[in-house]
Design a protein with these regions (language model features):
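Left-handed beta-helix
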Residues: 98, 105-198
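Feature captures the FAD/FMN-dependent oxidoreductase FAD-binding
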Residues: 27
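Well-ordered alpha-helical segments embedded in enzymatic catalytic cores
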Residues: 3-6, 119
Length: 198
């Protein structure tokens, strides 16, 4: 929340009606326009993009959600000791810009600084908060293990092709850097070098 508060002047000077908030530790491909269409159709105050975590991820590392039949979030618990569901927040949210400004200002006045706990969880029974289920690959790389596992996932041709050979395309940033160097005696296995730029 503090990072958002530091950008209040930017939010206030913007004219877009909606804001997409996206965590920087997720690996995924998403068309935010589809999430926005869902958000508008539901007349939601907040939309939380969700994922169903696999066996390799512990849901208690994330915000765990319960959702009703209409997609509305009925319960939201941040990093529970025992997760009762595998539906988690991906850290991607859509909200009306003016509402976000009001909630940030109110939270800061009350010395509340956690976006999830002090806004989403606090207002879950007051605001219309909906879940938009992600139906494609998502991985959170906030730990060394998850970072490693995500890199190992990219050895899978289907995952590589999904990210680098299917629309929408992803291009790496072009930098003029020297190539990786492998010395005599190096032992490299299970490797996939990907450099796609345009």
């Amino acid at each position: 929340l503090d990072a958002m508060a530091q950008n209040l002047s930017f939010l206030k000077n913007s004219h877009e009606p909606y804001v997409v908030i996206a965590s920087g530790d997720g690996v995924y491909k998403m068309d935010y326009n589809k999430v926005l269409e869902f958000h508008i159709a539901k007349k939601a105050d907040f939309t939380v993009v969700t994922a169903d975590v696999t066996d390799k991820d512990d849901p208690s590392r994330f915000g765990v959600l319960r959702v009703d039949g209409d997609g509305r979030i009925t319960d939201f618990e941040e990093k529970p000791i025992n997760a009762e569901t595998s539906t988690v927040s991906t850290g991607v949210y859509i909200v009306r810009r003016r509402m976000l400004i009001e909630l940030i200002e109110k939270s800061m006045q009350e010395e509340r600084y956690d976006f999830v706990k002090d806004i989403l969880i606090r207002y879950k029974n007051v605001k219309k908060i909906y879940a938009y289920p992600m139906d494609s690959y998502w991985s959170n790389i906030s730990s060394v293990d998850s970072y490693y596992n995500t890199n190992m996932d990219f050895l899978n041709k289907d995952i590589r092709d999904y990210f680098f050979r299917q629309y929408p395309d992803i291009y790496s940033k072009v930098e003029d850097l020297p190539p990786a160097k492998y010395n005599v005696g190096s032992n490299v296995k299970n490797l996939s070098l990907i450099h796609i730029s345009e």
